Structure formats: structure tokens, C-alpha cells
Amino acid sequence: MTLKQRYDAVLGYFRDNVPVAESELHFDSPYQLLVATMLSAQCTDKRVNLTTPALFSAYPTPEALAAASEEDVLALIRSISYPNSKARHLVGMAQKLLSDFGGQVPSEVDALMTLPGVGRKTANVVASITWGEPVIAVDTHVFRVSRRLGLSRGTTPRAVELDLERHVPADLRPIAHHWLILHGRYVCTAQRPHCNDCPLTAWCRDFAERGK
């Protein structure tokens, strides 16, 4: 099977069988998505969703968050992984949104990455979901699934991202990000992947190699 055939088969399956795939984070605005995505680093979406209602109630706008103390923000996100650094980054992010972007979440990945605490993955998530930018955010699930399926042999998230963007049509990239995340979260799990329940085994390089 050629690489193109594998991509065509995997994307074709998802397109035909999973026409709707969305983020499991809860948010109502680009600002809320940015905050939630920053909190989700090395933390589950479920835990983030339990935390953000109180945070968004206390700080409903970038202006409110920019004026907050790190200690007050920390008190609301203690159940999140790395709460101290995330509290510092959230306040710094909001302050830079005000000073550099008029309080508006920018659409460009490079601009988003100038915000404290915003790396390439977070920037790609926000640019893709909020603005429909043709980018693919590579988190641990996307990285794992892409390598197992044989969509990439990249050894870094950036290398996998470049492989995916080289082969996934631009109009499919925003939803392809969700396809791969959800597949990794519920089927192609890190420990004990559910291969017997996986509809992609016919095209999966890892499954084929383990079956030899």
C-alpha cells in the first residue's frame, strides 16, 4: 500500500462515517477556547471542563483576566496540571492580548505563538477551530495515531504536523485534527489499543507489522 492509498483510505473512512467531529472542550468564544486549550496541556478535557465555568464566570473577558492576580487565578485552577505556571501564563496572555491585539484573539498561528504559554499546538487548535485555518494541531493522540497508522514516521510533533499537512487536503485539515484526536482518545489508546474494535486495521501499518 502506498502512502497516498493509506491517506485516501483513512480520510475516506472518516469522511464517510464521522461527518461531524468537534472539540470536547466547552467554550463560547475565541477567548474561552484559547483559555481552555492552554489549560488542557497535559490535562484531560473532562478536568478542564469542570474547571472553566468558575474561571469564565470570574474572568469573562480578556480585560478581566488581565487585571487579575496570579494568586486569584491559581485558586480557581488548582485541580489542573501545572496550575502555577498556567495561572501565570493566563494572566500574561490576557495582558498581551490587550497590549498587542486590542483584546481580540488573533487568527494567525505566528501571532498566537507570541502570547505567553501558547505553543504551536495550542496556536494551531485555536486557529483551526476559531478561524478555520488549514492547520493540524499535533497533540499526543494525533502523534500516536499518525505514527501507528503509518501516516507519518516523524519523531517530533512538528515533523508529524508537516507530514499531515503535506498529504491532508486543506479543506479537511480542521476536521482531520478532531478525527485523529477522538480516534486516539477512544480507540487507538496509548495503552492496550482497541484494535479488535478499530475500523482502520486494514490500512494500519502498526497492526500489519504486529501481525507478521
Where are these regions (language model features)?
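Catalytic cores of DNA base-excision repair glycosylases
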Residues: T2-K212
